[in-house]
Curated annotation (Swiss-Prot):
It catalyses: [ThiS sulfur-carrier protein]-C-terminal-Gly-aminoethanethioate + 2-iminoacetate + 1-deoxy-D-xylulose 5-phosphate = [ThiS sulfur-carrier protein]-C-terminal Gly-Gly + 2-[(2R,5Z)-2-carboxy-4-methylthiazol-5(2H)-ylidene]ethyl phosphate + 2 H2O + H(+). SUPFAM superfamilies: ThiG-like (SSF110399). GO terms for cellular component: cytoplasm. Homotetramer. Forms heterodimers with either ThiH or ThiS. Pathway: Cofactor biosynthesis; thiamine diphosphate biosynthesis. This is Thiazole synthase. The gene is thiG. It is found in: Cytoplasm. Its main location: cytoplasm. Belongs to the ThiG family. It comes from Rhodopseudomonas palustris (strain BisB5). Transmembrane segments: none annotated. PANTHER family: THIAZOLE SYNTHASE (PTHR34266:SF2).
Length: 260
């Protein structure tokens, strides 16, 4: 089980609901991923029309917990306003907070992120902030009241995997009591397993599954990878070595030397 504020969740894989080839494939992929938390963009939901109604109906059928996000917001004011609208629409105090600074990298505006988190937490929100792997930013978010931190592995949709392993490991070491979720930049199941092997509590994925040739099969692959990585972490990984170490003990004289 992993703790998200006052809730215990079984699945350590969170999944996004955008970019799938069709609504039916989205639903099948989410179901096969085993995810219990699904992120939803407020802007997509409020687009209206039959397509929006169909989308929301499919999400409800899955019986998952919806985590609305402020994707696309580029200012504190815009993010706070979007979060408040999401709370009314989805009847939840959870919000995945995104404040974007740069259009090319979609890097978070960490200054605006902290400010928006402070405002929302004072207003009763439980904030899931999308941030960089910078420890100082994470500490400020924790000081603001965030109990979940979601650092990126690499830019959104880049599929590059973990680009700053040492920084992510430092976050885990320094924030042992905070729920840490790697969010953005993972492109392969092996990337998810690596994040879990670092001791992260969960990963959030969207593009890597939605844009796969077979999104449903890829959802299953990521599900297994997350479970394998978590089990490996719990089992205790051996440390890397600079030199070889024989796996077979060499004791005494080789048996063939004793043959006359």
């Amino acid at each position: 089980m992993v703790k998200f504020y006052d809730r215990d969740i079984s699945s350590r894989l969170l999944i996004g609901s955008a970019l799938y080839p069709s609504p039916a494939i989205m639903q099948d992929a989410i179901r096969d991923s085993g995810a219990e938390i699904v992120t939803v963009s407020l802007r997509r939901e409020t687009a209206g029309g039959k397509a929006g109604d169909q989308f929301w109906s499919l999400i409800r059928e899955l019986g998952v917990t919806v985590l609305p996000n402020t994707a696309g917001c580029r200012s504190v004011r815009e993010a706070v306003t979007t979060a408040k609208l999401a709370r009314e629409l989805f009847a939840t105090s959870w919000i995945k907070l995104e404040v974007i600074a740069d259009n090319d990298t979609l890097q978070p505006d960490v200054v605006g992120l902290v400010e928006a988190a402070q405002i929302l937490i004072k207003d009763g929100f439980e904030v899931f902030p999308y941030c960089t792997e910078d420890l100082s930013v994470a500490l400020r978010l924790v000081d603001a009241g965030c109990r979940v931190i979601m650092p990126w592995a690499a830019p959104i949709g880049s599929a590059r995997g973990i680009t700053n392993r040492d920084a992510l490991k430092l976050l885990r070491d320094r924030l042992p009591d905070i729920t840490l979720v790697v969010d953005a930049g993972l492109g392969a199941p092996s990337h998810a397993a690596e994040a879990m092997e670092l001791g992260y509590d969960a990963v959030l994925l969207n593009t890597a599954i939605a844009k796969a040739e077979d999104p449903v099969a890829m959802a299953r692959a990521f599900r297994l990878a997350v479970d394998a990585g978590r089990l490996g972490y719990q089992a205790g990984l051996m440390g890397a070595r600079d030199f070889a170490s024989p796996s077979t003990p060499v004791i005494g004289t080789p048996f063939w030397h004793a043959v006359s």
